[in-house]
Swiss-Prot record:
It is found in: Plastid, Chloroplast inner membrane. Belongs to the TIC214 family. It comes from Solanum bulbocastanum (Wild potato). Residues 775-816 form a coiled coil. Involved in protein precursor import into chloroplasts. May be part of an intermediate translocation complex acting as a protein-conducting channel at the inner envelope. It comes from the Eukaryota. This is Protein TIC 214. GO terms for biological process: protein transport. Pfam families: Ycf1. Residues 1578-1597 have a biased composition (Basic and acidic residues). Its main location: plastid. Residues 248-300, 786-805, 1569-1603 are annotated as: Disordered.
Length: 1887
């Protein structure tokens, strides 16, 4: 068995090796290329099908295979690839050959290729067949691209090691595939020839010469097919000759721009990040070859060829292009356009020898004048055809306002080149481009063999050995520190600290980092961000010298003067430490100096004269070495680099020499100097709509008021240069008129999902179930308010979507008219025609017809009324967008731009006019509901509400006529049936009348019945109405029925009996029979009626001819009842079944409703208790202060008021879930008698304790509500290994992907990390009770410093500690009850610190803020203060503004942990522990309206219980202002501009903060004040501002803004006066201090934009249209009044003045401030802090943590005294190692980084198995005991150690990650990381 499995395993491994081998993969890829059929197959197919003789077939096959073999060889052999891939040669070969081939096949008589006696291989036709197949196989990849083979081969070739073997096997696979293909083709052809059915076809037999003609014309058919195919393929590639050329910018412009742009350097990370995404097509590579050009990765033959051509053409090419290169690379700031290079160098030499600059200038100008008249044909042909500087590629023009010339988009962000690292050749992405260029020039000059000889490998071995030694030393030091720690010595000796120079040891003032010699890294110099104007405007001489020195190497090492490449690559050498290639170069220079002869080929320098060459030869070696070093040494002072500091690594960005203007620029006339030039950029379709022209002035376009109207159609051409190549995107299409992106048809079903079965089943079942059960009341309870609001929201949403759909259809029609050529002309004429037809033909003819009709019907005509309405109708000409002009004026260029015709007061034909003296109330209501009385004329003469809208329904002319007719017919029917009724009642009188009279009467009744029947068909409703009005007397009704029935029977018998001769006997029998049947019928009917009435009566009919007088005997009656009973018994089973079902349904519904009803009762009782408490409070309040009451606003009223404020914020759910448990139980506890017995059973339920807050449980336990044995239960946790699931464990993180994407990352990170930075005090148990003392110290420290520095010396240490804690918690979260680390940096607690000692109470573990919903981040909540703290960096409670609506969102305030603080008493007077004392109230950063009055008061209340009392005397500034502008809250992200300097308190602009601090310093602080005392003290405090009292009413009144703002301004005025007088500063005087505050807010900190309100936007546009109309009218009063009546013009917007300040606009709701989400360029440190996610903190935030490191590492023997042992929980007897989770923390951060890099990147074993061997083997866990040297391990399960991952976050490799993100991550810019490669922490090794 073992042997078999061994054999099987070997077999499997052997098969895997064979499958993965290079040969098999090559064969597979080669075989695949068989299916890559291109145009080259046409010749092979033609030869196999049509050619006669084996020679031609053999030659075709040979040529085909030879061409493919050349292609495979060219993949590996670069020169052949260059030769084949050069577009010039291929073009030169292909175009004449195609012409020749076409000519050959169509004019064969020019060539005699008949059979000769010579050798057949010399036959021209056979050679042509060979050439056809060979050349077109080569064409297939370049002119006629087939991408499958190239992609597959290149992808694998890049990965493959043995490239020759792969290419060979690929060719063999291709050969096998094609042999099989040709064999199969031959078999098919033989089968066709031999198939009898094909040959015996009737059509073929009838046309004898059909096959012959087909064979003769096959050559032409193939040539036509080939031509069509070539045109199709070439259509994707723009012809280089036919491409639209662009004119270069004028010389003066270039000179100015070159001066402006010379020293400008753009950081590639920010400026170039979007360029890669803008490139499209398949040929948009870099035209400048990179140093890794001949590697197999992504190079293009086109760009190589451009480079080669420039080399070949040498001097002439450089003449014309040198100026543009100087301009692009920034070397030129004099007018050197078209200056030849040899002049440049001659002048340089002369200038070097003589120093005479003027001679140089004169020489330049002379040479320029000489060359001005040179003709264009001096340029070579290739330069004319293929100019790399032309826009003949699919580039979009990225316009930069600072630099008018565009950046060349094909330049890369990074520079890649190979260098040696650790003795291995590696690709570096931050290689200095200048060094690469220089090294390339040296390699060209010196043979490769000599370079290899002169570069020994000693440096590499030395480099590796030193690195190993350093790594070993670091590991030893690390382990030594760990051993000392195991020996339980003092921990402060173990920690590695950073040494810094200190000015004052007591104050801990350090030397600035920039001047600290003990620091290294980026602090040692300033970073030069840009170049000042003074440096730019240096003298000509200095710039010239600088440029000359930069070009020294160029003059020495460049044989062919490839200026095009050099000017792009010769950047200034970067300030990075030089890599190993510099060292290699230095050794090379030394060897050159020691040689007797220089190995440089100086004779090859073509630009030197002989005299100069001799002088160069005679130079001394030392001079040569100095000369080279002067040229390349970046630190030489003579090189013109006078600025001190570190220059950032950046590239000179090349620019195009063209200035391109868009179509819109040309229309707007912005570039008047280039008005004659046609636009070169395609812009978005737009129209310039002139809405007003000042006719009095000249025709200056500035006197016109114009709007730009953009087309909303999908336009994927915009931004593309005219004549540029389009993208070679196949399989893409545009399916909609408005489409954001181009989609592939493969994914159409995913884009538009099928909605056939997507319906809500519950919505369908609910009405059926409701009707079945008939229980409406229960369903009313079941359907809560939420469902009602949801339904209403759904209706509103559907309505909005419907309107949106209609709007899109309208826009689609508008765009369609725009796109169709000549459509506007046709439409304009049609509209004018329809307007004339309507006004002068159609409407007058209708008026005439109507009045003639009235005259025919003998009614008065209404000529005057109709003509008056007809005259009232106005047809106003409007622009295409609906801007009104006048009745007579036509828009400018209306035939081209389009026209609209707006009809004011449209005429509607009415059948009659109602007198207007006394209009009825219904008409008045109709007028109110009526829409605006205007419409737009459509092309078909219809009326539409909006331009291009759907035609509206016009009121019908005949509808009121029909209604009137119906009324009259109804009246007639009523009268008619009343007469019928009277006649029917009097039929009794006709009993004694003779039979003849009866007969006549019966006939008349029959006739009337027919009429009645017909009328009932016409209008049955009226008939039934009259039927219901019947006699009330039932017996009378029954008698009448019997009488009429008997009359009918008698008539029946008489009519029938008239036909018999002896009718007396028969007549009597039939009479008896009819009597009997009628009696039975009457009995049945009477019984049914009696059953209904339950009053049995026996009706004795006297009109019987037989002797039976009493048929209704009881016996008969009981028989009928018996039959009924049998029927009931038969159906009893079904009755029972139905009854049981109904019973079940009732029970089921009642069970469902029980929890709903109980919760409702509970909430109602809670509400009553709360309201009772509030009413008591308010009664007391009124007794003390006679002020207006504020009613408690419960959640429902909040919801209602918010709904009234704005229906736009329909996603606000003020649900009862927002009420925290703390709030509810606090209100319950405040009742006079605590009677919670009714809740005892609920609270004692087993699962309840899992969901109640811990401190609430403790509180109720003391009250005796909870059982004492009920412990703090935790929900069961499951072992999940992954980080995602750990996050998902906290429900706040468990969101859908869409909602995650809507989160603002910075806000969420900010909120999450607020608790991480909390103060770290109260370490000792002895200091646990000294709250006030510590708070006062902390309070003073915080207020002493104005601006905080970036960080103190412990910031990084604490940051790394928290970082390690987070990493640990992600692994060991399951054992939360056993490990000490019960608090995580993700928690947000009541401003308690993250306790680093051992507070082991279970309830503190990961106590996520249950009610701080993540919804806060997903929407802008319109509640007063709900989002006040969202953008704070820290969870700083001093700036949280509590209000009524916020209590439901913050639950952390009632966490009174008796276990952790035994001295805290839970009573009425001690509600809350406050561990931070702030000025002006803990929760309210207030504006003291009267600081002097505040100073007089002896007491200052800092805190009312959780802010729950309804009136708080000091309201914050922002509490008023942001109520109306919730968008302001988003602006608190101050990190966008000044991230680390501005402290939190300065963001709130309370300018008198310091004064208030001084006033309040010596006052008694009342910390724990109950609500009753608070009420008493309130009378002594500052008066409450009216804005707080009026807040509730303001909400319901939809925000009455003015009183609040006016009061707010008065408050602020006092504040500003106070601050101005005390500080003595001269401030800008504002009209309103709100404006001053706003100005400070906007000017100093934030990027912002002013956005119109949505509702205002539409109103403003309507106003603009009306204004445009009024400006043109002579007497605009009438139109103005009618516009106001029709609500077209909004008067509140009309009142906006020109000088209205910003605050007034905001008060009116006109403008809303919102931030601009711009990418702001940050320095590297800021990006690092952002990426880490646990950011640095302000200095003041950690000043209370001075004891941090002294108390953190204490002696382990005394460790237990720091462990807090709770009263009711188990005592933690285990000693806790709280810092040994992350052993690296012993080292300092810089050394830690070094340890990680060395241990990871220097790892010799790079395989996954070797790397993770520590963790994959359980037995190796004991090796970690050196870190955790304990008798008892901290962990329960050793396997958890396997999950001990240490993340390689980019805080130490940020620059590498930012550069490598294009390869490691799926992003194109360095601003975000989509994924990080996380590696296991490697095992420490000591060699």
């Amino acid at each position: 068995m073992i042997f078999q499995s061994f054999l099987l395993g070997n077999l499997v491994s052997l098969c895997m090796k064979i499958i993965n081998s290079v040969v098999v993969v090559g064969l597979y890829y080669g075989f695949l290329t068989t299916f890559s059929i291109g145009p080259s197959y046409l010749f092979l197919l033609r030869a196999l099908v049509m050619e006669e003789g084996t020679e031609k077939k053999v030659s075709a096959t040979t040529g085909f295979i030879t061409g493919q073999l050349m292609m495979f060889i060219s993949i590996y052999y670069a020169p052949l690839h260059l030769a084949l891939g050069r577009p010039h040669t291929i073009t030169v070969l292909a175009l004449p050959y195609l012409l020749f081939h076409f000519f050959w096949n169509n004019h064969k008589h020019f060539f005699d290729y008949g059979s000769t006696t010579r050798n057949s291989m010399r036959n021209l036709s056979i050679q042509c067949v060979f050439l056809n197949n060979l050349i077109f196989q080569l064409f297939n990849h370049f002119i006629l691209p087939s991408s499958m083979l190239a992609r597959l081969v290149n992808i694998y070739l890049f990965r493959c090691n043995n490239k020759i073997l792969f290419v060979t096997s690929g060719f063999v696979g291709w050969l096998i595939g094609h042999i099989l293909f040709m064999k199969w083709l031959g078999l098919v052809l033989v089968w066709i020839r031999q198939n009898h059915s094909i040959r015996s076809n009737k059509y073929i037999r009838s046309n004898k010469y059909l096959v012959l003609e087909l064979r003769n014309s096959m050559a032409r058919i193939f040539s036509i097919l080939l031509f069509i195919t070539c045109v199709y393929y070439l259509g994707r590639i723009p012809s280089p000759i036919l491409t639209k050329k662009l004119k270069e910018a004028s010389k003066t412009e270039e000179r100015v721009e070159s001066e402006e742009e010379r020293d400008v350097e753009i950081e590639t990370a920010s400026e170039m990040k979007g360029t890669k995404q803008e490139q499209e097509g398949s040929t948009e590579e870099d035209p400048y070859p990179s140093p890794s050009l001949f590697s197999e990765e992504g190079w293009d033959p086109d760009k190589i060829d451009e480079t080669e051509e420039i080399r070949v053409n040498g001097k002439d090419k450089i003449k014309d292009k040198f100026h543009s290169h100087l301009t692009e690379t920034g070397y030129n700031n004099i007018n050197t356009s078209n200056s030849p290079i040899y002049d440049y160098q001659d002048s340089y030499l002369n200038n070097n020898n003589t120093g005479n600059l003027e001679n140089f200038k004169l020489q330049l100008l002379d040479k320029k004048n000489e060359n001005q008249d040179l003709f264009w044909f001096q340029k070579p042909l290739v330069s004319l055809l293929f100019d790399y500087n032309r826009w003949n590629r699919p580039f979009r023009y990225i316009k930069n306002n600072r630099f008018e010339q565009a950046v060349r988009t094909e330049m890369s962000q990074y520079f890649f080149d190979t260098c040696k690292s650790d003795g291995k050749q590696r690709i570096s992405f931050t290689y200095p481009p200048s060094l690469s260029t220089f090294w390339k020039m040296i390699k060209r000059k010196i043979p490769l063999l000599s370079l290899q000889k002169t570069l020994p490998n000693k440096l590499d071995t030395q480099w590796v050995s030193t690195n190993k030694e350093k790594s070993n030393n670091l590991n030893k030091e690390f382990l030594n520190r760990l051993e000392i720690l195991d020996k339980e010595s003092l921990s402060m000796d173990i920690l590695e600290t950073r040494t810094r120079l200190c000015n004052d040891d007591t104050k801990k003032e350090y030397v600035p980092k920039m001047y600290d010699p003990l620091l290294n890294g980026p602090y040692r110099g300033t970073i030069k961000k840009g170049v000042s104007s003074s440096i730019i405007n240096n003298t000509l001489l200095e710039n010239w010298e600088k440029r000359v020195r930069l070009n020294r190497i160029h003059t020495i090492f460049l044989p062919n003067i490839d200026y095009q490449e050099f000017e792009q690559k010769a950047y200034t050498i970067d300030k990075k430490p030089l890599s190993t290639e510099i060292d290699e170069f230095l050794t090379l220079i030394n060897e050159l100096g020691n040689e007797p002869k220089s190995s440089l080929n100086v004779k090859g320098l073509s630009l030197f004269s002989d005299q100069e060459q001799r002088r160069a030869k005679s130079e001394n070696r030392t001079k040569f070495v100095k000369f080279v070093f002067n040229a390349i040494d970046p630190n030489e002072p003579k090189s013109g680099k006078k600025s001190i500091g570190i220059k950032e690594i950046s590239k000179k960005v090349p620019r195009w020499s063209h200035k391109l203007i868009t179509e819109l620029d040309q229309q707007m006339g912005e570039f008047q100097d280039r008005a004659s030039i046609d636009h070169q950029l395609r812009s978005r379709k737009a129209k310039r709509v002139v809405i007003f022209t000042d006719n009095n002035a000249t025709n200056d376009p500035e006197e016109e008021v114009a709007l730009i109207s953009y087309s909303q159609q999908s336009d994927f051409r915009r931004g593309i240069i005219k004549g540029s190549m389009r993208a070679q995107r196949r399989k893409t299409f545009i399916s909609k008129l408005f489409q954001a992106n181009v989609h592939s048809p493969l994914f159409v079903d995913r884009i538009t999902p099928l909605r056939l079965f997507s319906f809500d089943i519950s919505e369908l079942i609910k009405p059926i179930f409701r009707n079945w059960t008939g229980k409406e009341r229960e369903f009313k309870i079941l359907e809560s308010r939420e469902e009602q609001t949801k339904r209403e929201e759904k209706k509103e949403k559907d309505k909005k979507e419907d309107n949106k759909r209609k709007e899109q259809a309208r826009i689609a029609i508008e765009e369609a008219w725009d796109n169709i050529p000549f459509a506007q002309i046709i439409r304009g004429y049609m509209l004018i025609t329809q307007s004339i037809l309507r006004k002068y033909i159609l409407l007058p003819s209708l008026i005439i017809a109507k009045n003639l009709g009235r005259m025919l019907f003998l009614q008065l005509p209404e000529w005057s009324e109709d003509l008056q309405e007809w005259n009232r109708e106005m047809q106003i000409k409007c622009t295409y967008n609906g801007v009104q002009l006048s009745e007579t004026e036509f828009p400018k260029d209306w035939l081209r731009d389009g026209i609209q015709i707006k009809i004011l007061f449209p005429f509607c034909l009415k059948p009659w006019h109602i007198s207007k003296l006394y209009p009825s109330r219904g008409e008045l209501m109709k007028k109110k509901k009526q829409k605006d009385d205007f419409c737009f004329l459509t092309v078909w003469g219809m009326e539409a509400e909006l331009p291009f809208g759907s035609p509206r329904k016009r009121p019908s002319f005949f509808e009121p006529i029909f209604k009137e007719l119906e009324k009259k017919i109804g009246k007639f029917k009523k009268k008619y049936f009343l007469t019928l009724k009277i006649l029917k009642g009097k039929t009794k009188l006709f009993r004694s009348v003779s039979k003849e009279t009866k007969k006549w009467f019966i006939q008349s009744i029959g006739f009337l019945k027919k009429i009645k029947k017909e009328l009932s068909k016409v209008n049955p409703i009226v008939l039934f109405r009259f039927k219901e009005i019947s006699e009330s007397n039932e017996t009378k009704k029954e008698k009448d029925y019997l009488i009429s029935n008997q009359i009918i029977n008698e008539s029946f018998s008489q009519i029938e009996s008239g036909n018999w001769p002896n009718s007396s006997l028969i007549e009597k029998k039939m009479k008896d029979l009819t009597d009997r049947t009628s009696t039975i019928k009457n009995q049945i009917e009477r019984i049914t009626k009696e059953k209904k009435k339950v009053t049995p009566e026996i009706d004795i009919n006297p009109n019987k001819t037989n002797n039976i007088k009493k048929l209704e005997s009881p016996k008969k009656f009981f028989q009928i009842l018996k039959s009924r009973n049998t029927r009931v018994i038969w159906k009893f089973h079904y009755f029972l079944k139905l009854f049981i079902q109904r019973l079940y349904i009732d029970l089921f519904l009642s069970i469902i409703n029980i929890p709903r009803i109980t919760t409702q009762l509970f909430l109602e009782s809670t509400n009553k208790l709360i309201e009772k408490f509030i009413s008591n409070n308010e009664i007391n309040q009124e007794k003390i202060t006679n002020k207006k009451k504020i009613h408690f606003i419960f959640i429902s009223t909040i919801k209602k008021s918010l709904y009234n404020i704005s229906k736009k914020n329909s996603h606000i759910f003020c649900d009862l879930s927002y009420l925290s448990q703390a709030y509810v139980f606090y209100k319950l506890s405040q009742t006079q008698v605590i009677n919670l017995s009714k809740f005892r059973s609920v609270l004692q339920y087993n699962t309840t304790s899992c969901f109640l807050k811990t401190k609430i449980k403790d509180y109720f336990k003391k009250l005796g509500i909870f059982h004492s044995e009920l412990k703090h239960k935790k929900l069961q946790s499951y072992r999940i290994n992954q980080w995602k699931n750990w996050l998902r464990w906290h429900y706040q993180y468990d969101l859908s992907q869409i909602r995650w994407s809507r989160l603002m990352p910075k806000k969420w990170r900010t909120r999450v990390n607020q608790s991480c930075m909390a103060q770290n005090k109260n370490r000792n148990l002895n200091k646990w009770n000294s709250y006030e003392k510590d708070q006062l110290i902390h309070y003073k420290k915080e207020n002493d410093s104005e601006l905080y520095s970036l960080s103190n010396q412990k910031d990084n240490f604490k940051k790394c500690y928290r970082y390690g804690l987070l990493a640990y918690k992600s692994i060991n979260y399951e054992n939360k009850s056993d490990s000490f680390f019960s608090r995580l940096p993700f928690q947000v607690k009541k401003n308690l610190e993250i306790s680093y000692n051992s507070n082991t109470s279970k309830h503190n573990f990961v106590d996520m803020p249950v009610n701080l919903h993540i919804n806060n981040y997903l929407r802008k909540v319109n509640i007063l203060d709900i989002e006040r703290n969202l953008d704070r960096k820290y969870f700083d409670w001093k700036i949280i503004h509590f209000s009524l609506r916020q209590k439901g969102d913050i639950e952390a305030w009632v966490k009174i942990d008796t276990n952790s603080n035994p001295n805290t008493k839970i009573g009425i007077n001690n509600y809350q522990i406050i561990d931070k004392i702030e000025k002006k109230g803990v929760f309210y950063l207030t504006t003291h309206q009267n600081p002097e009055k505040t100073q007089k008061n002896s007491k200052k209340v800092f805190f009312d219980w959780m802010g729950m009392n309804e009136k708080i005397f000091n309201r914050p500034i922002l509490n008023l202002e942001f109520w109306f502008f919730p968008e302001f809250v988003l602006l608190y992200n101050v990190y966008k501009i000044k991230p680390w300097i501005i402290p939190s308190k300065f963001l709130l602009f309370n300018l008198n903060t310091n004064e208030n601090v001084i006033q309040n310093k010596n006052q008694k602080q009342n910390f724990f004040l109950p609500s009753n005392k608070k009420i008493k003290n309130r009378s002594q405090e500052t008066k409450e501002p009216p804005s707080q009292r009026e807040r509730g009413s303001d909400i319901e009144n939809k925000g009455n803004l003015s009183p609040v703002f006016s009061k707010h301004q008065t408050d602020l005025e006092k504040d500003y006066v106070e601050s101005d007088t005390k500080k003595g500063q001269n401030k800008k005087q504002y009209k309103s201090n709100t404006e001053a505050e706003l100005d400070l807010f906007l000017k100093r900190y934030l990027l912002f934009q002013l956005r119109w309100n949505d509702a205002l936007n539409q109103r403003m546009l309507e106003n603009i249209k009306v204004y445009c109309l009024l400006l043109r009218l002579i007497n605009p009063t009438k139109i103005t009044i009618s516009s106001i009546q029709r609500r077209e013009m909004s008067l509140d917007i009309m009142l906006i003045q020109a000088n209205l300040p910003l605050t007034d606009l905001m008060k009116k709701g006109v403008l809303i401030i919102e931030p601009i989400r711009l990418s702001v360029k940050h320095n590297g440190q800021f990006i690092m802090y952002q990426t880490i996610g646990i950011s640095l903190v302000h200095k003041s935030k950690h000043q209370t943590n001075q004891r941090y490191r002294e108390q953190r590492y204490v002696d382990k023997k005394n460790f237990d005294e720091f462990i807090l042992q709770p009263q009711t929980q188990r005592i933690n007897t285990e000693k806790t190692h709280f810092d040994l989770l992350v052993p690296e923390n012993i080292l300092w951060s810089r050394r830690r980084r070094e340890l990680r890099i060395r241990s990871f990147f220097n790892s010799l074993n790079w395989n996954v198995v070797d790397r993770n061997s520590v963790f994959c083997n359980e037995t190796n866990v004991k090796n970690w005991s050196q870190f955790l040297g304990e008798r008892k391990p901290l962990y329960k399960d050793k396997n958890e150690l396997i999950k001990f991952k240490f993340f390689l976050w980019p805080n130490y490799r940020l620059e590498d990650l930012a550069c490598m993100n294009r390869y490691w991550f799926d992003t194109n810019n360095g601003s975000r990381f989509s994924i990080l490669r996380i590696h296991m922490y490697p095992r420490l090794k000591i060699n």
